[in-house]
Amino acid sequence: MIKKKLVFDIEMVGEDFDSMDELTKQDLMKSLPDRAVDEKRYQSELEELKRKLVFSPLTGKVIAIGVYNPDESKGAVYYDAGKSKPEDTEIDNIKYVAMNEAEMLTKFWALAEVHDEFISFFGRRSDVPYMMIRSAIHGIRPTRDLTSNRYANLAAPSAVHYDLAELLSFNGLAMYRGSLHRWCRAFGIDTPKTDEMAGDKVGQAYKDGKYLEIAKYNALDIIATAKLYDYWDRYFKPQL
């Protein structure tokens, strides 16, 4: 039986720190240095704290989920378009569909239910737990366990998750690490990172209303991940 593959990747943004309630601000700021002792260090670490809000599903949210079928070279990006309501569009076999966070998470888990193999870059430790928490916040139950059995590559029955960040570092055994950009560079794959858009620029792009640009960047991520998987599949995957 042919296994149905799904490459996936997400984009997130953090909350606006200044708009948070005071109790939450104080809780987040507990570890900051004494402002009266070192104002410069305090301000520096406060800015870093604000920058890192995106990395927690408690202080951030999903604004794009990209999915891609590497066998058919087709995919979709479900993305948050703010208050605008753009028409669905398709560019180079990638559909772009505007949705709110709850809708895109519901769509992802519906797709997950009918796929067998999942491919990501750093998805087991980052994307999947993030989506699971955000899903629970919206009252959505995941349909697959994509975090368990890391070393065996086995998750829930009939589901396999290939996290390339883990696999290419031999599950942490190797002394080196690499970003998706560096792995793509090494294998001659077009990198999704550009001067205009990269992971650390998504937050500002979202504030600026560049929703489709973020979605297109996410599409480049899933395509690059699919190409990187092809290298791993051909040259690293154990032959059974």
Language model regions located:
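Entry/capping segment at the start of metal-dependent catalytic domains
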Residues: 1-60, 73-75
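Metal-dependent phosphoesterase core characteristic of DEDDh/y 3'-5' exonuclease domains
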Residues: 2-4, 60-63, 67-94, 98, ...
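Alpha-helix capping and helix-coil boundary motifs
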Residues: 29-48, 93-96, 100, 142, ...
